[in-house]
């Protein structure tokens, strides 16, 4: 509902002032402010659990604030649903896209508000209006295409176009580039800047510092439910923002390298996946205590390497040798028995059971080993091992019965890593291990990885973040179009050299 209080000066499109919100035993927001100007891109930053989501839920009426005021275009607002917010010009593009995959693009654009001709939907008008918006935003998508046939990046464009169709003045974007290629990211940034030119205020949420400095004008930082600062980005450094987010200065983004790679424990020769296009003739060694990175552009088939090693993909040729003995992993169970573990890329869809507790999520990969002599589960051992995961991985949680979906991304990832360590692996493979994780939690994950390498684990890390690979690995294997284009020593290589190798077979 929009009230008719006195308009503000007009300097801001959106003013959230002194917002407070409490839950039983928890002060989620404590006097928080967010002020967004027209013609601006405003970063909203903070560690997971800082209060960003709660603040936006108060804006959209999903939560009712306890106190504070929200002004939109100078008038006090009190929305009771996201639909009401959208109809009044405030839209959100979620990290998990809200589209009907079986319907056409234009159906998704106008769902619930179809243009009609008499008693029927006016398909021609719907097509024309969709096409006009796409043309204005330089979106090259057929309005009649089925959404399920599109890429993630194209789906995000549709969500943005939908916000545009509502004539949204405030557009909130939550981690919009997490699954995009560099080319797709650049196209997305072009569209965001077009919205800015039209007078929109964009609230941009991302853990990727490089994007924030490339795109945004101002930043608001939250920490532990409190407003810390709102400042122009032009006067800030990455270290300054990190210090505001975590409450202390992070003297280093990556832990010191104390691991000393030993003998070769894994030899991969001419590994080729059965179903092509995929990896072809992949060869490399992995040493005890070594952290081997895998780099490459999107489509380089990096993930196919670890999936083939883990038995998810069937190999058609090549050999896998562990401690001098040839092995074959026909499925995940065989891989686990041979000492392999895989932390998958999509944490929420393939890594965790979000609505089940930490105990279940800690033990699921090893559950058959908890049966006693009569075939019943040994609850005492299960509880003990769950507590080991919580303690050794430094998981921040009230207890092992806590639903894992309620934890931050960093703590979820720690549970997944701990789960695999219970299987006592020799080879730990991590696919995008810090995706969607805030900067403080990233450092904790890096520390865990470094500690595991120091204990002699062979570690393989796939990452799209070049600074991450250069910061924590010993060597980097570079993939290009399913082929190994080079293996480089991290100490002596450069980002430009890795990018050159990544483009070698395109």
Curated annotation (Swiss-Prot):
Keyword Endoplasmic reticulum set for record: no
GO CC terms for this protein? plasma membrane
Domain (ABC transporter): residue spans on this chain: 14-249, 264-506
- Catalytic activity reported: D-galactose(out) + ATP + H2O = D-galactose(in) + ADP + phosphate + H(+); methyl beta-D-galactoside(out) + ATP + H2O = methyl beta-D-galactoside(in) + ADP + phosphate + H(+)
Identify the EC number(s): 7.5.2.11
Spell out the SUPFAM superfamilies in the cross-references. Answer: P-loop containing nucleoside triphosphate hydrolases
Q: Name one GO molecular function term.
A: ATP hydrolysis activity
Q: Which Pfam families match?
A: ABC_tran
Q: Which Gene3D superfamilies does the entry link to? A: P-loop containing nucleotide triphosphate hydrolases
> Subcellular localization, per the record?
Cell inner membrane
Q: What superkingdom does the record give?
A: Bacteria
Q: How does it sit in the membrane?
A: Peripheral membrane protein
Q: What does this protein do?
A: Part of the ABC transporter complex MglABC involved in galactose/methyl galactoside import. Responsible for energy coupling to the transport system.
What is the protein name given in its UniProt record?
Answer: Galactose/methyl galactoside import ATP-binding protein MglA
Q: Which organism is it from?
A: Escherichia coli O6:H1 (strain CFT073 / ATCC 700928 / UPEC)
Q: Which gene encodes it?
A: mglA
